[in-house]
């Protein structure tokens, strides 16, 4: 084990820790913000000589010499005993469709077992955690309640609490952290796209949210997870935080991330949000709105194998140049409902799970929103 290594290997670890510290200081010089993953000097001593599992996807990365390095690769190079990876929605490599079932597999690059936490199984079992001492959670969130990584973190925390395992969350800024808006989730509407009584946009980082899960006793039987958050340094939630990578296959840029809390409602309507195009969550339309000039045609592509209205021309709106939002904007949802010919079939059965209650649907139907 690392703590029992000879002096020469201890020196190597010391050098590596300080090398990563230099990288972090360079990041501070660039934008004055240090995120959790960059603070190797804080979390590496907590995991040396321990068996580690990691909950991550493609967003678990940092930049060194203008190159992106994944957390798993970084820790393996530091001789950390990474035993397995738990994968959330979209998979470990982040290239699977929304809602697509993920199966257990072996990562071809590292040879590590990948255990799915999306599909029939959403929570690590006691067997999964056998001989695991610590779990590290590092996934980029976008600050919207229906983004399922929060629910994955909830169940990981619950499993850690049940099996007396420490959880380390490497915190990351929230790109929609500059506002709080939307109805608080009602108990009868809770599901995997919303497990907690919070607004749609909650303004917290994922590390802050993890602390709230513990503090509010939201885990089963009021369990408490042994939680350590590697916090962000020099984070200002009122400043725009631009991601340098897609947090998921259908959020390709900052505009889509900013529009996502306002457009995700359409996922439970007949309206396309551009899945199967290059403008995901930046356009809306259906084949039946022929009075609109703008059009797009969804096609099957990686991350959107069977998009809504596949191969049909959809007419609607291009929202690429909409002003940056600091609130949820319902005007597009209301407009879509007014333009829908078959209003009885506009809202699908799962709409209330996205909205957080059944009231919003009724208000729109009655013209009260």
Label the model's feature ranges.
Residues 279-369:
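Conserved functional hotspot residues or short segments at active or partner-binding sites
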Residues 141-153:
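Glycine/threonine-rich flexible loop motifs
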Residues 233-310:
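Glycine-rich, aromatic-lined ligand/substrate-binding cores of catalytic
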Residues 103-132, 144:
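Glycine-rich oxoanion-binding loops at beta->alpha junctions
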Residues 1-32:
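Bacterial Sec-dependent N-terminal signal peptides
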Residues 81-90, 170:
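Short internal beta-strands
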Residues 190-262:
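Conserved anion/nucleotide-ligand pocket segment
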Residues 93-99, 168-190:
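Glycine-rich, charge-decorated loop segments at or immediately adjacent to ligand/cofactor-binding or catalytic sites
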């Amino acid at each position: 084990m690392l703590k029992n290594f000879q002096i020469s290997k201890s020196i190597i670890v010391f050098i590596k820790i300080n090398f990563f510290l230099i990288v972090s200081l360079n990041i501070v010089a660039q934008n004055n913000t240090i995120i959790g993953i960059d603070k190797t000097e804080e979390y590496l001593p907590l995991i040396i000589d321990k068996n580690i599992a990691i909950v991550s996807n493609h967003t678990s990365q940092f930049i060194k010499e203008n190159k992106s390095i994944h957390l798993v690769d970084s820790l393996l190079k530091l001789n950390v005993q990474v035993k397995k990876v738990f994968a959330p929605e979209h998979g470990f490599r982040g290239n699977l469709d929304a809602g697509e079932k993920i199966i257990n597999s072996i990562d071809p690059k590292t040879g590590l077992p990948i255990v799915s936490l999306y599909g029939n199984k959403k929570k690590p079992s006691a067997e999964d955690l056998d001989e695991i001492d610590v779990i590290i959670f590092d996934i980029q969130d976008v600050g919207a309640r229906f983004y399922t990584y929060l629910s994955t973190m909830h169940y990981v925390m619950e499993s850690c609490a049940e099996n007396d395992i420490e959880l380390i969350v490497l915190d990351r800024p929230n790109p929609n952290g500059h506002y709080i808006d939307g109805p608080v989730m009602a108990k009868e509407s809770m599901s995997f796209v919303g497990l907690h009584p919070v607004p749609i946009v909650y303004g917290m980082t994922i590390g802050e949210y993890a602390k709230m899960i513990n503090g509010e006793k939201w885990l089963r039987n009021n369990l408490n997870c042994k939680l350590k958050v590697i916090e962000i340094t020099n984070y200002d939630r009122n400043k725009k935080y631009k991601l340098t990578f897609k947090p998921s296959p259908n959020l390709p840029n900052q505009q889509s991330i900013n529009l996502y809390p306002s457009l995700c409602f359409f996922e439970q309507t007949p309206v396309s949000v551009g899945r199967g195009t290059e403008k995901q969550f930046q356009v809306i339309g259906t084949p039946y709105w022929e009075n609109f000039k703008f059009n797009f045609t969804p096609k099957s592509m990686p991350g959107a194998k069977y998009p809504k209205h596949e191969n049909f021309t959809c007419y609607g709106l291009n929202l690429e140049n909409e002003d940056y939002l600091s609130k949820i904007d319902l005007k597009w949802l209301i407009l879509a409902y007014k333009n829908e010919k078959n209003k009885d079939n506009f809202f699908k059965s799962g709409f209330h799970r996205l909205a957080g209650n059944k009231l919003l649907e009724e208000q729109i139907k009655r013209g009260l929103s």
